[in-house]
Amino acid sequence: MSDALVLATTDVASIRPAAAVVIPLLAASLIAVSGRRPNVREAWTVAAALCQFALVASMVPDALAGRLHATNVGAVAPGIEFVFRADPLGMLFALVASGLYVVTGIYSIGYVRGLGEHAQTRFFAALAVSLSGAVGVAFAGNLLVLFVCYEVITIATYPLVAHEESAEARAAGYKYIAYAFSGGIVLFTGIVGVFTLAGTTAFAPGGIDALGEVDPWLGRALFGLLVAGFAVKAAVMPLHSWLPDAMVAPTPVSGLLHAVAVVKAGAFGVVRTVTDVFGPAAVADLGLGAPLAAVAGGTILLASLLALRQDDLKARLAYSTVAQLSYIVLGVALLTPAGLLGGLLHFPAHAFAKLTLFLCVGALYVETGTKKVSEVAGIGGRMPLTMAAFAVASLSMAGIPLLAGFVSKWHLLVGSVAAGGWVFLALLVVSGVLNVAYFWPIVYAAFFERPDDADPKPILDNPIGGREDAAGLRTDGGNGEESDPRGERVGWRGDETTPLLLGPLLVTAALTVAFGLFPDHVVFLEVANAVVESVTGEGFP
């Protein structure tokens, strides 16, 4: 559909894309039968994450060379095959999701044991299935396969959102399911429409040719159905309210929702719709780029203003995510190569920084019980590494140079100018200022303010729910034995938190810095540039 040169690619029959999807499913089964052996259960979690990431990473060189690994499971209906295909766009999302599954899985072990969480086996099994769905979305070769994997994410993340089983958690879970399934119905309606008119749902760089011949109003309707269906999970306003409510979930789940799988899957679907279903040329011809950009811009501004009002740390991060995910939508809606590149680079840039923020908030809660912005005064002296990582991620979210957020936002600024969207240029600058306004007071209070009372949030001894006894053996930490629900208020071995909590957040903070300092040496830029070339025929040196 686009006049741009589409780079030649060749499908290579391979089991690897399907294996990357199936491995977490197998791990979920093994986790389920290992419930009485927590160390074995958690070993399966980490092993599955590492294997999935290794498989995904192994396909990157071939994807960049135009050799696309594909697994054709077979035809599910005339004209529709169940295909997993590792193209550059899918590789970008799969690399982020599978890589951060490793980090989230390790962190989750420390978190659920530290708090003595119940139903840990269910937690880790659902986490594994969620990542299977996320990589399935990434490698889906057509809209139908994407839809199936998209709904797998919905089903798998419901027990994670409602994990606490409180009235508030159940209500949040029901709301999430209602929104997600409603969006799924809208999405499926659009998929049926695409197949009816085009005779295929297979993705094609630059768009499906047959959709360029349909009646313009019918084309706009189909585009609206697809984008609206994906926008629910992407938390685009006014379809966002499920996300702040879902923050009742355990912090690793919040990180999964925001940085790894759920909202990223929604944003990914919007990108697929613009680039590989309709194509930028058709979207421009139908006059749909400007309205989509306007919705994204409004979401960025309103969500940033709402974030300023939140005292709950996770709620502030939730509204930040609502705003930040619309950067991706805005980038693709600008219909310029630079805008598309910026939107694509925001997948890893936002993921690294936002996951860091959530992991820091989780560590604060495990060790001190801190949940609110108004409670962080002086906590930087107790947990300096944690709050330093929080500061780095906050600066990245604001788009400060030499950090990951600047890399993506710079290209978004360039794309806005190229599109003549000076309003969006100004909006991006204002959004950066608002990010500073709602993140930096947390960092300042943590390091430079004194608490009102002598020791408002001392570090807990265990972490909560588990500790080592005199014999050096770790107590239950939530695996079936009774344990102190809070622990004693002194430092755990004199450290700010356990290695299982501190290590992952330092890794994601380091990735945020590395991506900002050396973007040309990080694979995400090369992969994103390959997507831009395949869709528009234009690349960046």
Set out the residue ranges of the language-model regions.
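Cytoplasmic/organellar membrane-interface segments at the starts of transmembrane helices
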Residues: 201, 383-387, 441-541
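Short phosphate-coordinating micro-motif centered on Lys-Gly-acidic
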Residues: 151
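Transmembrane helix-loop-helix hairpins at membrane boundaries of multipass inner-membrane proteins
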Residues: 2-18, 26-125, 466, 472, ...
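Inter-helical loop and helix-membrane interface segments of multi-pass membrane transporters/permeases
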Residues: 2-10, 182, 204-218, 282, ...
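Helix-to-loop transition at the C-terminal end of transmembrane segments
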Residues: 61-69, 194-202, 519-524
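Alpha-helical transmembrane segments and their helix-start/interface "positive-inside/aromatic belt" motifs
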Residues: 38-49, 171-181, 383-387, 495-507
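Hydrophobic alpha-helical membrane-insertion segments
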Residues: 46-60, 180-191, 393, 505-520
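Hydrophobic transmembrane alpha-helices and their helix-loop junctions in integral membrane proteins
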Residues: 103-116, 121, 127-146, 156-445
